[in-house]
Amino acid sequence: MSKASALLAGLTGAALVAAHGHVSHIVVNGVYYRNYDPTTDWYQPNPPTVIGWTAADQDNGFVEPNSFGTPDIICHKSATPGGGHATVAAGDKINIVWTPEWPESHIGPVIDYLAACNGDCETVDKSSLRWFKIDGAGYDKAAGRWAADALRANGNSWLVQIPSDLKAGNYVLRHEIIALHGAQSPNGAQAYPQCINLRVTGGGSNLPSGVAGTSLYKATDPGILFNPYVSSPDYTVPGPALIAGAASSIAQSTSVATATGTATVPGGGGANPTATTTAATSAAPSTTLRTTTTSAAQTTAPPSGDVQTKYGQCGGNGWTGPTVCAPGSSCSVLNEWYSQCL
């Protein structure tokens, strides 16, 4: 499909389709960096140069377990490297902010990996990247909630720390939520990998070994094929073990942006951060960003009454919300607790 055709299709469904989400930006040391926006940037002939990887997830969709052995699981569907990077120091904390609000029903783990690029990340072959896990939070029995719940409570954001002893160099940060609301059934889990280019300064000499992205998970792993609806579940976060000295997560908080940065391109530089009067993030949840919504004319009459958007919940035990799906999708039963517009 050409981009022109895809743009027409995207605009036609813009008022109806609202899937799960993507990372909108990061905040590090008070500086806001814009990420790739698959819902708008993909359609632009000259999209902005950003730190995030380009991916063909215009519907804010996911990678299914049947594709975990393919390159799509590395940095999302048909992903290509971002055109620039952000500079951080070893030991820095990065606030990763999602949009739109992560669905309450989409419970599951939050996982972060790094991979050394051994050169410019902007031109790296994604199949050559070897990923090591720097955090991975699943179900917290003491708190009685999933990591995705903690992300929602933290202003729809996640705080991750770059290892303080990490060797300086260029790295890709792979941040991911795995939604388990349909994981009781084969091929029911939903992975949302997001990749961001970083240049890490300072640090030490630690460069952990890693695994290829296509080897991170299997569709039958205990943390992928899993019933999350049991009381106080015993859950194993999928993927390789955490690197030595890493914790499953750090204490979560949001970060206030006091300046706006731009992506640095190889051999050049991004603009110096400029002060901003609007906080990109603040204590839960008050991200303030200007957005523009375009609604295309309806070519067919929508169903009457409450209509659930594509990928939204449309049924399940105790469900009292919409049961009619937007045009182009139908209500599919994933298990007795959850039905989804697909």
UniProtKB/Swiss-Prot annotation:
Location within or outside the cell: Secreted
UniProt binding sites for Cu(2+): H20, H106, Y192
Temperature and thermostability: Optimum temperature is 65 degrees Celsius.
SUPFAM superfamilies: Cellulose-binding domain
Bridged cysteine pairs (disulfide): C75-C195, C117-C121
Keywords: Carbohydrate metabolism, Cellulose degradation, Copper, Disulfide bond, Metal-binding, Monooxygenase, Oxidoreductase, Polysaccharide degradation, Secreted, Signal
Activity modulation notes: The presence of lignin presents a significant source of antioxidants, which probably increase the activity by trapping liberated oxidized fragments.
Catalytic activity line of the entry: [(1->4)-beta-D-glucosyl]n+m + reduced acceptor + O2 = 4-dehydro-beta-D-glucosyl-[(1->4)-beta-D-glucosyl]n-1 + [(1->4)-beta-D-glucosyl]m + acceptor + H2O
Positions annotated to bind O2: H181, Q190
Region annotation (Disordered) ranges: 263-308
Oxidoreductase found in the keyword field: yes
EC identifiers of the protein: 1.14.99.56
Keyword Nucleus in record: no
Biological process terms in GO annotation: cellulose catabolic process
Record note on biotechnological use: Lignocellulose is the most abundant polymeric composite on Earth and is a recalcitrant but promising renewable substrate for industrial biotechnology applications. Together with cellobiose dehydrogenases (CDHs) an enzymatic system capable of oxidative cellulose cleavage is formed, which increases the efficiency of cellulases and put LPMOs at focus of biofuel research.
pH dependence: Optimum pH is 8.0.
Cofactor: Cu(2+)
Signal peptide (UniProt feature, chain positions): 1-19
Annotated CBM1 domain residues: 306-342
Note accompanying the cofactor annotation: Binds 1 copper ion per subunit.
Example of a GO MF term: cellulose binding
Task of the protein: Lytic polysaccharide monooxygenase (LPMO) that depolymerizes crystalline and amorphous polysaccharides via the oxidation of scissile alpha- or beta-(1-4)-glycosidic bonds, yielding C1 or C4 oxidation products. Catalysis by LPMOs requires the reduction of the active-site copper from Cu(II) to Cu(I) by a reducing agent and H(2)O(2) or O(2) as a cosubstrate. Hydrolyzes weakly barley beta-glucan, carboxymethyl cellulose, lichenan, wheat arabinoxylan and birchwood xylan.
Protein name, UniProt field: AA9 family lytic polysaccharide monooxygenase H
